């Protein structure tokens, strides 16, 4: 048989980008003479071949030098292992710019320098007369209002200087940005150009004229505009080289005023430089002009470019550790999406912070890059710049603005060495708190000797949607204009030059922080990012900002609270509480007798309670910010829909609580049984619902007799073939350990018979003493209680030992693991212990159960559920909660599921064991032992190896499944599902069909067996709810029943059919199915099953003689096999679809 397959590998990961920062200052651009030639490779001469050096005995045992000793000590004290040091050094080598590339960039800069000097002058015109510009060029600034005083003419630059990270040697790959500061001649500017955006307009016109003369030059592949850090008052010109170096570098041209041109005291944060009458175009006599700190700061940052670069150059001289630390911090920031956009923490800010720590002796010039990184993270983690700002200024000039002045004007304060520029002017309180939070979490990772700190900190990306538990998007940013009006933010809007997003964002976040209160540990937002645009297009408007998304990191215990208790009715704060919460606030009497203001949110189920943060966000934004609910896309709980069944709303956590309560009651009854020959020593449940991780927990059932056939002698019901298959009743397994005693026999077969007697006796006593309906068998007793069926299995702790006994021909007694003994140990020892531990984990992390259920639902929906045990998935999910770095533990099932997909897709299953430290029992030496044992025995171990404190060497839950091929298939599905789902969650304008990733791709399969929904008992559990449902023989919960009959337990015709298929044809094919309501079975032929076999009676099943072969060989009888699929499933199989375009015989 030949297969016709399209091989599709996993999608290529896009290279991460790193935004070079604008480091301020300038040295004249040095023009090196000559061009570098590429080295020609040649074969080395025989004499040049490297050979091992033979050391003399004295050299071999020579004591280490001081440098070597220092390096060894540093490695011992600072790095957990020498590996971490090598990893960091390797990363720095990878991201730093190579000398060859630097020479290419230098050549490109020299040519730009020459071109800029040849741009012609223009005659002087009014600022508003822009007819001299070609029609193909648009001014890269929003000119609102358009009328402004002033004259403009273009004159060649008075200087062109390289500034920023390129000159400092701190720019990193893959996105190399080189900043060119082009200084406007003094003749272009007038004394009052600091007023009313005159300087900003002239700066933009200067850039536009440069762009018009570079646009058609063959040197450039593209000439575009963008805003520097998305600040619309600071457009820059982007130049990229033509040819193979197009992606090597982007040169950013900044226009700045001559040093010292503007009087700095006029630009202090408490000064006004934008007149209200000019901005509103209305007369406003007698109005106090508000300060314009952000506008002033924008001009000052241009003025101080050169000073900042000199400052950083002085700090970086003789300090290689600073350059390394800046590079590492840039990678760290980039992985957390903190380095781009309006109010970002970019590389320039990182370099300035390091220079501040150097000036305060928090670090010194002999420190390595790693030491500096740690100290910087420590400073960020412990210093709140929103409360206690810092300044680098050493001047004692009392006329300079104080830190208090800066705090009055800005949310985050970090003042430059001149004492006039706030380097964090555009940053919000919430964004800085996120940076603090990330720094704290990173230090924990670095201090954890069991974690791979380097990988978690610098190699794992933290996309916004995977970092926060809940995310919502503002789909129509222009609605924030109404927010500014509602909140009366005209003064702030003037300061921000009409940027209503930057104006309103801090106030909106403040309202949300107050409303959500203790429900959130962190509230942050994406950084508004305006796109680059063509020089012939109108400049990017405020509404063109990238989607504004807000993330909530929830407090696990508090975010589902439905009560917001306010102050006492007669207190002074009651009025403020009522004003804040509006009509939602009401007076309530509490159990302690107090009468207080309160807000109560709906929440009858956990599914509904998870939506409380969403209700708060939508209500407060409409009440205080005039943002209607229709403009908010809240994606925090959208995947809950895959955990609902039928018409019932909710994700059924309450059902599991009901089962656990019934189980606890049964446990007490078993403990207290009298007249048992031996006492019960423990009762332990093993069903997934007892650890809150069953995808669809058992429902309480009351069978309707009319839908069944009655076996009166057994007083139980059986399915009626004339009617739809009865509802699936899952037995909840319970292990009942009996005490050890000399009465137990010492033979495994005799023990089984004694256990069978115990099962019968248990049923009799439960019937007699507690009036419970019981159905005993040789291996278990089914107990019908509260509508649930509990399967009680008696266990004796020494039974596995007797099963291992083997008597040799010599009469020696040996102990050897057998399949039967291992299975019994798994069921009666390991599984109860694991269930108990995971039950405790759910109590600690309430999102564990929901995450595990979602993960299992997805695996089953991909038709791979039979290859992964419930316990395997539970342990994978437990790893996300016990080892969450670089994240915090998930507090919502949805974000837990995203991280589950990422873990499966990116973990190195081939070379690493996944260690799940349940109850924190594993210590440092245990990790080393597991790693070493794994490496030494890798070939004999399962492809997916999961180690726990009680299972360090065997990986019990993945011993037989999955196979390497199934795991590889799952990894590909994880990558694609994660990409598609995260794209959906971050793009509210796209498809809102979130079930898309839960629908399996069927094009892979050779045969599809379509099933009759009438005979699928779990049809209501399907991802896509069936339009038509069938009566499954169950009465409603409140229905009265005269005489209870034992329901049909564990009957699923589809599973019976699958078992028959695998037993009969497992040699030829693999069978895939979703047990949760799936109506299709995917069949994949095994290539090995189609190899001709010798003519023997053992090979006859499913085969015929090969007529084409001279020898008597057997080949599969495909037509008969496909026909058998239908015959075996008569009544259950609707059709068999042989997709012969995929295979041929």
Swiss-Prot record:
GO biological process terms held by the UniProt record: ribosomal small subunit biogenesis
Subcellular location: Nucleus, Nucleolus; Chromosome
Entry keyword set: Chromosome, Nucleus, RNA-binding
Residues annotated as transmembrane: none
Gene Ontology MF term list: RNA binding
Superkingdom as given in the UniProt entry: Eukaryota
Primary subcellular site in the record, as a coarse category: nucleus
Keyword Nucleus applies: yes
A GO term from the CC aspect: nucleolus
Gene3D superfamilies in UniProt: 1.10.1410.10, 3.30.70.3030
Pfam families attached to this UniProt entry: Nrap, Nrap_D2, Nrap_D3, Nrap_D4, Nrap_D5, Nrap_D6
Disordered: annotated span: 1-46
UniProt keyword RNA-binding present: yes
Similarity comment text for this entry: Belongs to the NRAP family.
The protein's role, per its UniProt record: Part of the small subunit (SSU) processome, first precursor of the small eukaryotic ribosomal subunit. During the assembly of the SSU processome in the nucleolus, many ribosome biogenesis factors, an RNA chaperone and ribosomal proteins associate with the nascent pre-rRNA and work in concert to generate RNA folding, modifications, rearrangements and cleavage as well as targeted degradation of pre-ribosomal RNA by the RNA exosome.
Subunit structure: Part of the small subunit (SSU) processome, composed of more than 70 proteins and the RNA chaperone small nucleolar RNA (snoRNA) U3.
Protein name: Nucleolar protein 6
Organism of derivation: Xenopus tropicalis
């Amino acid at each position: 048989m030949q297969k016709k397959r399209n091989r599709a590998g996993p999608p290529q990961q896009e290279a991460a980008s790193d935004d070079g920062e604008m480091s301020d200052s300038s040295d004249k651009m040095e023009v090196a003479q000559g061009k570098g030639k590429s080295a020609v490779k040649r074969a080395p001469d025989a004499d040049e071949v490297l050979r091992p050096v033979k050391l003399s005995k004295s050299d071999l045992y020579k004591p280490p030098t001081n440098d070597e000793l220092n390096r060894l000590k540093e490695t011992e004290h600072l790095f957990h292992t020498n590996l971490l040091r090598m990893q960091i050094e390797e990363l720095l080598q990878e991201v730093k710019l190579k000398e060859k590339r630097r020479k290419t960039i230098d050549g490109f800069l020299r040519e730009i320098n020459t071109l800029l000097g040849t741009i012609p002058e223009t005659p002087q015109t009014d600022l508003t007369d822009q007819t001299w510009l070609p029609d193909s060029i648009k001014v890269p600034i929003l000119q609102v209002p358009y009328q402004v005083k002033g004259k403009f003419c273009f004159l060649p630059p008075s200087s062109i200087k390289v500034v920023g990270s390129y000159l400092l040697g701190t720019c990193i790959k893959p996105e190399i940005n080189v900043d060119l500061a082009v200084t406007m001649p003094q003749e272009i500017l007038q004394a009052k150009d600091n007023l009313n955006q005159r300087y900003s307009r002239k700066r933009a016109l200067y850039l536009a004229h440069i762009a018009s003369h570079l646009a058609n030059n063959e040197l450039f592949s593209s000439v575009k505009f963008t805003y520097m850090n998305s600040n619309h008052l600071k457009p820059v010109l982007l130049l990229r080289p033509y040819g193979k170096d197009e992606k090597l570098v982007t040169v950013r041209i900044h226009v700045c005023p001559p040093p010292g041109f503007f009087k700095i005291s006029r630009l202090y944060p408490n000064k006004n430089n934008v007149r209200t009458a000019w901005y509103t175009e209305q007369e406003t006599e007698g109005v106090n002009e508000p300060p314009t700190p952000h506008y002033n700061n924008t001009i000052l940052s241009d003025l101080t470019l050169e000073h900042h670069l000199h400052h950083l150059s002085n700090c970086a001289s003789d300090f290689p550790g600073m350059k390394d630390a800046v590079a590492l911090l840039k990678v760290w920031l980039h992985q957390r999406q903190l380095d781009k956009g309006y109010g970002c923490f970019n590389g320039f800010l990182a370099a300035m912070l390091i220079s501040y720590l150097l000036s305060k002796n928090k670090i010194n010039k002999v420190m390595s890059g790693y030491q500096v990184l740690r100290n910087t993270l420590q400073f960020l983690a412990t210093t709140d710049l929103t409360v206690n700002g810092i300044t680098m200024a050493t001047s004692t000039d009392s006329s300079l603005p104080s830190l208090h002045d800066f705090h009055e004007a800005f949310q985050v304060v970090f003042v430059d060495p001149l004492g006039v520029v706030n380097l964090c002017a555009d940053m919000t309180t919430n964004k800085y708190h996120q940076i603090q939070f990330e720094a704290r979490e990173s230090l924990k990772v670095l201090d954890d000797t069991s974690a791979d700190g380097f990988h978690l900190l610098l190699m794992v990306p933290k996309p916004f949607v995977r970092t926060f538990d809940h995310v919502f998007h503002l789909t129509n940013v222009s609605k924030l204009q109404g927010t500014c009006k509602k909140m009366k933010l005209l003064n702030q809007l003037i300061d921000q030059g009409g940027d209503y997003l930057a104006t309103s964002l801090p106030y909106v976040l403040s309202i949300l922080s107050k409303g959500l209160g203790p429900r959130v540990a962190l509230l942050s937002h994406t950084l508004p990012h305006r796109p680059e645009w063509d020089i012939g297009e109108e400049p990017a408007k405020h509404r063109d900002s990238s989607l504004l998304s807000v993330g909530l990191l929830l407090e696990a215990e508090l975010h589902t609270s439905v009560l917001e208790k306010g102050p006492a009715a007669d207190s002074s704060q009651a009025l403020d509480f009522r004003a804040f919460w509006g009509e939602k606030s009401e007076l309530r009497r509490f159990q302690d007798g107090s009468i207080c203001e309160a807000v109560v949110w709906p929440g009858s189920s956990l599914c509904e309670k998870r939506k409380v943060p969403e209700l708060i966000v939508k209500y407060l934004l409409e009440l205080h910010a005039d943002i209607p609910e229709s403009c908010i896309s809240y994606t925090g709980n959208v995947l809950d829909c895959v955990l609902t069944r039928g018409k019932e709303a909710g994700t059924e956590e309450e059902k599991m609580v009901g089962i656990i309560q019934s189980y606890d009651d049964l446990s007490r009854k078993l403990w207290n049984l009298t007249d048992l020959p031996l006492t019960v020593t423990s009762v332990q449940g093993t069903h997934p619902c007892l650890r809150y991780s069953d995808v669809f927990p058992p429902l309480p059932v009351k069978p309707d007799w009319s839908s069944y056939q009655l076996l009166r002698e057994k007083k139980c019901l059986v399915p009626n073939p004339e009617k739809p298959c009865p509802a699936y009743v899952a037995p909840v397994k319970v292990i009942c350990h009996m005490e050890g005693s000399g009465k137990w026999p010492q033979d495994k077969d005799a023990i089984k018979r004694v256990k069978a007697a115990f099962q019968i006796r248990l049923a009799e006593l439960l019937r007699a003493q507690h009036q419970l309906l019981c159905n005993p068998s040789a291996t278990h007793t089914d107990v019908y209680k509260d509508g649930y069926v509990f399967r009680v299995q008696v266990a004796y702790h020494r039974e596995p030992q007797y099963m291992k006994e083997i008597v040799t021909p010599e009469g020696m007694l040996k102990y050897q693991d057998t399949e039967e003994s291992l299975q019994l140990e798994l069921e009666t020892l390991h599984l109860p212990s694991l269930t108990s531990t995971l039950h405790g984990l759910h109590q600690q992390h309430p999102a564990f159960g929901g995450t595990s259920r979602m993960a299992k639902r997805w695996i089953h929906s991909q038709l791979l559920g039979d290859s992964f045990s419930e316990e395997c998935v539970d342990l994978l999910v437990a790893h996300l909660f016990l080892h969450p770095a670089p994240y915090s533990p998930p507090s919502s099932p949805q974000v837990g599921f995203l991280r589950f997909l990422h873990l499966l897709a990116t973990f190195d299953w081939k070379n690493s064991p996944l260690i799940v430290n349940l109850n924190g029992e594993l210590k440092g030496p245990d990790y080393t032992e597991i790693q070493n044992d794994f490496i030494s025995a890798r070939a004999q171990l399962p492809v997916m190896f999961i180690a726990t404190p009680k299972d360090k060497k065997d990986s019990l839950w993945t011993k037989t499944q999955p196979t390497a091929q199934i795991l590889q298939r799952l990894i590909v599905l994880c990558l694609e599902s994660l990409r598609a789902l995260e794209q959906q969650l971050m793009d509210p304008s796209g498809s809102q069909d979130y079930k898309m990733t839960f629908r399996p791709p069927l094009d892979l399969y050779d045969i599809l067996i379509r099933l009759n929904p009438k005979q699928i008992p779990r049809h209501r559990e399907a991802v896509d709810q069936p339009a038509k449902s069938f009566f499954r023989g169950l009465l409603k919960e409140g229905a009265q029943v005269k005489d209870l009959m034992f329901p049909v337990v564990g009957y699923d015709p589809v599973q019976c059919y699958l078992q028959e298929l695998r037993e009969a044809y497992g040699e030829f094919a693999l069978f895939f199915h979703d047990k949760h309501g799936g109506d299709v079975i995917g069949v994949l032929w095994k290539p090995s099953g189609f190899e001709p076999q010798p003519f023997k009676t053992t090979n006859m099943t499913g085969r015929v003689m090969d007529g084409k072969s001279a020898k008597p060989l057997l080949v599969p009888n495909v037509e008969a096999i496909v026909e058998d699929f239908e015959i075996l499933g008569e009544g259950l199989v609707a059709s068999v679809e042989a997709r012969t375009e995929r295979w041929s015989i």
